[in-house]
Regions:
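Short recognition patches in nucleic-acid-associated and regulatory proteins
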Residues: 88-116
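Short cysteine-rich clusters marking metal-coordination/redox-active sites
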Residues: 83-87, 127
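Extended alpha-helical scaffolding segments
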Residues: 1-41, 45-49, 93, 137, ...
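Short beta-strand-alpha-helix junction that forms the catalytic/metal-binding core
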Residues: 112-133
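Short metal-coordination and nucleic-acid-contact micro-motifs, chiefly zinc-binding Cys/His arrays
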Residues: 75-82, 120-123
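Short Cys/His-rich Zn2+-coordinating modules
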Residues: 46-72, 104-113
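Intrinsically disordered, low-complexity regulatory regions of eukaryotic proteins
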Residues: 4, 8, 68-70, 82-83
Length: 540
């Protein structure tokens, strides 16, 4: 049943019924030929008969009408009529037609100023066979194309260097994406059963993603953002290559703005990359628990389970498409730019760290999470050298246990992490001995100054013993003076490296700061702030 409020649609068809035409009468007991005929309905004029349609004749009339549409922009015949696609001669039609909406003339495209609209066939033309192939292909491509999720497009267009602006992301324009699987071999070189399976797989893809994932099928949304399912016949064979097309605008009018075209992607590479991201997120539950006390909600975790979302946050919208192509082609990804953007976002949040603490935690999570992704990715593509990754769990375990003599501060990242951990521990003591004052806000980040390595050393680390003595918690802080001495000594030894790798130091500093959960209360109860900001993240 249809609800009264639901919109009803109807189709009125005028049929010319004859004894041997496209539509003809047949006895009620007549069974239409499978794949060649179809029942239209019972005859009202002849109750004992029904109307049957001849599909083969309908197809012929369909192509006649489609070719007539193409002829509206011009048709050429003779030896001088050459197909722009296959080179056949004799009969060609204009490509600017209704075969594909991208080739319509309803927008100010780069059409020849020397040709009238009905003479466009002299520009680009197709023979009838290629015109039919274009019609088939365009309809299939339209069925394989979908709109990217709004949360993903908002993530893509969000500022890469300002965390506060990312909170107030406006509606972004729609971006369309489509995935095509193309065979490596020419169809003439394929076995008949392979061609049949390929066509069946394309039809499966055109139906869209099913609720129940097919056996062996690969969902491509993780690495492409496109809700598309790759059937097992294609996903399990490298005899095919994937092509992704991203565009915006109004495709129905041919007003298309191409964003990216990524070709020659191996299905096996797509599968391995998808598995890598899934495994990476599963392995991040310990980090989620350390930062947020509980796993991220489904909506809040979406950006960390999407390759396009991660790349846009790491490198920005302007480099996201090229980075996506590099990743799908197993090429090197830069790390310095990702660290730079992470440092800028953390610096923006540090100005109001007590109010933006939950967002800062998300930035720290992304920094450690994507850094681990880069580490696994470089191993996957066989890239040698690079950088050393110290598992945050190992360093945090030693710091929590105050096993300072066992700590090997190897590099700027380890130094920044230890400094951040120590500042957070001292801030907690300062908070409980100063009527709940904020150490960073009131003593370190003052008068609009920016927090950097020199500021941390001069106004935080070097004054800790003095503040602890004046506020009478020097006894409680005495257990951490060994760590303070270690950090200051290492800073003096690595000063030049820190200045060259300032972003590395600061991102690691905030990682150590946020991962220090402590055993008592934090400087400020940020549960209400967390709930508000988490609700905002989940609503997007």
């Amino acid at each position: 049943e249809v609800a009264p409020s639901e919109k009803w649609l109807g189709l009125l068809v005028l049929l010319s019924v004859t004894d041997a035409g496209i539509f003809c009468y047949e006895p009620e007991t007549y069974r239409p030929k499978e794949d060649y005929e179809v029942d239209v309905g019972k005859s009202q004029l002849h109750p004992s008969r029904k109307i049957v349609a001849d599909l083969s004749q309908i197809v012929e009339r369909f192509w006649e009408s489609k070719l007539a549409e193409g002829e509206e922009k011009g048709r050429l015949q003779g030896d001088g009529a050459v197909c722009s696609c296959c080179g056949a001669t004799g009969d060609v039609l204009s490509v600017y037609s209704k075969a594909w909406s991208w080739f319509t003339t309803t927008w100010p495209g780069p059409l020849s100023i020397f040709l009238n609209e009905n003479e466009l066939v002299n520009g680009v033309a197709l023979c009838p066979d290629c015109y039919k192939a274009l019609t088939f292909g365009s309809n299939l491509f339209n069925r394989l194309t979908t709109t990217l999720p709004m949360w993903l497009t908002k993530e893509m267009f969000a500022p890469v260097d300002n965390a506060s602006s990312r909170e107030h992301r406006s509606e972004a324009e729609d971006i369309f994406g489509g995935v095509m699987a193309l065979p490596v071999l020419d169809p003439s070189e394929q076995r008949e059963e392979d061609r049949a399976e390929y066509v069946e797989s394309l039809m499966h893809m055109a139906e869209g993603v099913t609720e129940k994932k097919g056996a062996g099928a690969l969902h491509l949304d993780t690495i492409t953002g496109i809700e598309q399912e790759l059937p097992m016949h294609i996903a399990g064979e490298d005899m095919y290559r994937l092509t992704m097309l991203y565009f915006s605008g109004d495709p129905s009018r041919g007003d298309v703005h191409l964003r990216a075209s990524i070709e020659d992607v191996l299905p096996s590479a797509a599968q391995e990359l998808t598995d890598m991201i899934h495994d990476l997120f599963d392995d991040s539950y310990a980090l989620q628990g350390q930062l947020f006390k509980e796993p991220l909600h489904e909506r809040a975790s979406r950006p960390y389970r999407s390759l396009p979302a991660m790349l846009s946050k790491a490198y920005g919208m302007t480099r996201m498409w090229s980075s996506l192509a590099q990743t799908l082609h197993r090429k090197s990804l830069p790390r310095d730019l990702f660290v730079r953007h992470a440092a800028l976002r953390m610096q923006d949040l540090s100005r109001k760290v007590e109010d933006k603490y939950y967002l800062l935690q998300h930035e720290v999570f992304f920094y450690l999470y994507y850094d681990q992704f880069l580490h696994h990715y470089r191993q996957w593509i066989g890239e040698e050298g690079g950088y050393r990754v110290t598992p945050w769990q190992d360093l945090l375990r030693l710091l929590d246990a105050r096993a300072y003599r066992d700590i090997d501060i190897d590099g700027v990242a380890d130094l920044g992490f230890a400094a951040g951990y120590l500042v957070r521990r001292f801030s907690r003591l300062y908070y409980h001995h100063t009527d709940q004052k904020q150490f960073l806000r009131d003593r370190v980040i003052t008068f609009g100054s920016k927090l950097g390595p020199d500021t941390i050393v001069e106004y935080a680390l070097k004054r800790m013993i003095e503040y602890a003595f004046k506020l009478k918690f020097d006894g409680a802080f005495a257990k951490d003076e060994e760590l303070l001495g270690l950090v200051l000594a290492e800073y003096q030894r690595q000063t030049d490296d820190v200045r060259r790798q300032k972003d590395e130091f600061m991102t690691s500093f905030w990682a150590g700061y946020c991962l220090n959960r402590g055993k008592g209360k934090s400087e400020k109860d940020d549960s209400s702030t967390r709930e508000n900001e988490e609700a905002q993240l989940m609503s997007e």
